[in-house]
From Swiss-Prot:
The lineage of its organism: Eukaryota, Fungi, Dikarya, Ascomycota, Saccharomycotina. It comes from Vanderwaltozyma polyspora (strain ATCC 22028 / DSM 70294 / BCRC 21397 / CBS 2163 / NBRC 10782 / NRRL Y-8283 / UCD 57-17). A motif (DEAD box) lies at residues 267-270. PANTHER family: DEAD-BOX ATP-DEPENDENT RNA HELICASE 50. It is found in: Mitochondrion. It comes from the Eukaryota. This is ATP-dependent RNA helicase MRH4, mitochondrial. Keywords: ATP-binding, Helicase, Hydrolase, Mitochondrion, Nucleotide-binding, RNA-binding, Transit peptide.
Length: 539
């Protein structure tokens, strides 16, 4: 295991001046992930046992976890296994179960009479329910591995809180139910995530009677003004959009609209509090002066994020799972070495053959396959897409920040919806002059590539759709049932690695990740299959 000797920076410069004069106490979240842990540390003791920690990447990106918090999480999960064991209003419990059953791709789960909550859903609701209706300001940070059901982990207490306001404080509810107010806000960093969370939350409109609204890039000012004439129970938007309320001339007192906001969620909080977002996010939070609950939610706890919580919200209480900062156990991780023959150092040839193998294997019978390809640089996306389409005949699209929100939503549609059944046998790309060669340590069979390799494909449609993008698509999006993922470039940090790999193998489903390496690839990247096998925590 390699250990980087580079410094574990970087703090937020935006707050450097304030930090120099005021030293806040370390938050409980900081202690839960091991503030002050040394870079060279590879194992920690837990009741006589050693817990492996793997130093991935050029920099130390993630805080080490306190083994004690992992033990507490496991002890709590040993006692809980059902929504019925949690303090949730019956109508909220039923609504949550219906949503989870509706959104799952598991046939067994859909047909089951009961719905089993995920670990983070159990732990979060158990801890939050103890003081849910306590009027004092409460800060909590929900942190769990990718694809673990974190969205529902914060929606359950939010729904329960709003319904308890109505039932436990009837006089207050009678006064506010017809007022032009906003009761809760969910902040997200991208409009794709705003749309995704909205599509989940709006399913409560019939049974829980919540008034749900999303304010995204396509919303016109007259529309939001008209909507704000009535009560909004849950507003889903970005911090910048909320701040725009104070710039709309048709709204005279934005502060009054926000005065009844009691529950605030920051989803993908490590992004919303990074140095490019933190000013807008902090201003948006300060515009909600009567907040009762402030929830931060993230799949990773980067050093910078933890430092920001220490400075701005030092009383934050952590809610974490034992698998935080670990790659999914259900992912099958393969290394594809582009430096060996027949690729001769060509990563694009290695990628094309990997996709060819995925398209032609026996996985996902009867359904259209989807694959996401991640690259480190935006400028590489058009090149990869052109090569895959023109030279190798793959059904491929590219997505970057240059695309409009509407274009991005259209491009990702086939990847965030369930896989489509195949009604006819489709021909997949066939590569001429194939001499089968097996790559050791992977399930890829390689053909004989030459610079003039052509593709035979008589059918314009393919049973494999490919999306090429950057980390723009690596955060929070629920790519439903996407079983294949290719890392065209090796992620440089453990943070990027966790979020990219987390687009597959979600909610205990199986997934495959193929990482293309070359002669420059470091040993810490090549060790990833063993990291997953040994259940190691990334740092």
């Amino acid at each position: 295991m390699m250990t980087s000797r580079l410094p574990s920076c970087f703090g937020l410069r935006f707050y450097a001046k304030r930090a120099a004069t005021i030293r806040a106490k370390p938050s409980k979240l900081a202690s839960s992930v091991g503030i002050g842990a040394k870079r060279s540390k590879k194992t920690v003791k837990k009741k006589g046992k050693e817990v492996d920690i793997f130093n991935y990447g050029k920099y130390v990106g993630l805080k080490e976890r306190d083994p004690g918090s992992e033990t507490k999480g496991k002890e709590l999960l040993d006692k809980l296994s059902s929504f019925d064991q949690l303090k949730i209003l019956p109508e909220v419990r039923n609504s949550i179960k219906n949503i989870i059953k509706d959104e799952t791709l598991s046939k067994k789960a859909k047909e089951s009479e009961d719905v089993i909550p995920s670990p983070i859903q159990l732990i979060a609701m158990k801890k939050l329910s103890r003081t849910l209706m306590d009027p004092k300001l409460q800060h909590h940070a929900i942190a769990a591995e990718t694809g673990s059901g974190k969205t529902m982990a914060y929606l359950i207490p939010l729904f329960d809180y709003l319904k308890r306001q109505e039932t436990e404080f009837p006089e207050d509810w009678e006064f506010m139910q017809d007022k032009a107010i906003i009761r809760s806000v969910i902040f997200l960093p991208t409009h794709e995530l705003v749309d995704q969370v909205y599509n989940t939350v709006k399913k409560t409109e019939n049974d829980l009677k919540f008034h749900v609204y999303k304010w995204d890039s396509g919303t016109k000012y007259p529309e939001i003004v008209e909507k704000l004439k009535n009560r909004i129970d849950i507003l889903i938007t970005t911090p910048a959009k909320l701040l725009n309320l104070f710039n709309i001339r048709m709204i005279s007192r934005a502060d009054r609209l926000l005065s009844e906001v009691k529950f605030v969620v920051l989803d993908e909080a490590d992004t919303l509090l990074d140095k490019s977002w933190v000013e807008d996010t902090h201003r948006a939070i300060r515009s909600l002066p009567n907040t009762n609950h402030l929830l931060f939610c993230s799949a990773t706890i980067p050093n910078d994020f933890n430092d920001t919580l220490e400075r701005l919200f030092p009383n934050t209480i952590p809610i974490t799972t034992p698998r935080l900062h670990k790659l999914p156990k259900s992912v099958d991780f393969k290394i594809i070495d582009s430096s060996i023959n027949p690729f001769k150092g060509s990563k694009i040839k290695a990628l094309a053959q990997t996709l060819y193998a995925i398209a032609n294997d026996s996985s996902e019978p009867g359904f259209e396959k989807r694959c996401i390809v991640f690259t480190n640089e935006k400028k590489d996306v058009p090149y990869i897409v052109e090569k895959l389409k023109v030279t190798y005949g793959h059904d491929c699209i590219g997505l970057t920040s240059n695309d409009s929100v509407e274009e991005r939503l259209e491009k990702i549609h086939d990847f965030i919806t369930p896989p489509k059944p195949i009604t006819m046998k489709k021909e997949t790309p066939k590569i001429e002059n194939e001499d089968s060669v097996e790559v050791e340590g992977s399930n890829i069979t390689i053909g004989d590539f030459s610079s003039k390799t052509s593709v035979k494909n008589s059918n314009s449609e393919s049973s494999l759709k490919v999306l090429v993008s950057t980390d723009l698509m690596a955060r929070g999006l629920n790519f439903q049932g996407v079983r294949n993922l290719v890392l065209y470039d090796v992620p440089q940090t453990s943070i990027d690695l966790i979020h990219r790999v987390g687009r597959t193998a979600r909610m205990q489903q199986r997934g495959r990740v193929f990482m293309i390496t070359d002669k420059k690839t470091k040993s810490w990247a090549k060790a990833l299959p063993k990291v997953i096998k040994k259940n190691m925590t990334l740092k």
